From Swiss-Prot:
Reactions accelerated catalytically: (6S)-5,6,7,8-tetrahydrofolate + NADP(+) = 7,8-dihydrofolate + NADPH + H(+)
Keywords, comma-separated and alphabetical: Antibiotic resistance, Methotrexate resistance, NADP, One-carbon metabolism, Oxidoreductase, Plasmid, Trimethoprim resistance
Organism encoding this protein: Proteus mirabilis
Name recorded for this polypeptide: Dihydrofolate reductase type 6
InterPro entries to which the protein is assigned, alphabetical: DHFR (IPR012259), DHFR-like_dom_sf (IPR024072), DHFR_CS (IPR017925), DHFR_dom (IPR001796)
Length: 157
């Protein structure tokens, strides 16, 4: 199963402040919406609660709480490992979409990392881990918006 991480991160590594994304960059989320359409997303519960359920996606939500879902598109798991075991039988590709603890747990297992680097230093308390050695940047495109950003793809190997 291919594992892709996808995140928007400030120049100083921030991805969140509490449950919020501490910026709004016009157009930046369109790529996320397009790439994750009809895909499985692996997220933590706080991220799922803050983003809400987007249409035409399936969610594997990792939580310490014992939650049962009646929605066939939302499945809860007690650990990242149990989510991966389930997803390995359900799909050939997942998008890991946060939060900080989930990224940290899976960054070394990722095959591809999709980053939108927001060209601003932002205050926050949730961070994206450094891209590990062994990843190589394979694509970069800059965008002008209300806050400029650069979309990057990093691939293992």
């Amino acid at each position: 199963m291919k594992i892709s991480l996808m995140a928007a991160v400030s120049e100083n590594g921030v991805i969140g402040s509490g449950l919020d994304i501490p910026w709004h960059v016009q157009g930046e989320q369109l790529l996320f919406k397009a790439m994750t359409y009809n895909q499985w997303l692996l997220v933590g519960r706080k991220t799922f609660d803050s983003m809400g359920k987007l249409p035409n996606r399936k969610y594997a939500v990792v939580t310490r709480s014992k939650i049962i879902s009646n929605d066939p598109d939302v499945v809860y798991f007690a650990s990242v490992e149990s989510a991966l075991a389930y997803l390995n039988n359900a799909t050939a590709h997942i998008f890991v979409s946060g939060g900080g603890e989930i990224y940290k747990a899976l960054i070394d297992q990722a095959d591809v990392i999709h980053l939108s680097v927001i060209h601003k230093h932002i205050s926050g308390d949730v961070f994206f881990p450094p891209v590990p050695q062994g990843f190589k940047q394979t694509f970069e495109q800059s965008f002008s918006s209300n806050i400029d950003y650069t979309y990057q793809i990093w691939a293992k190997g």
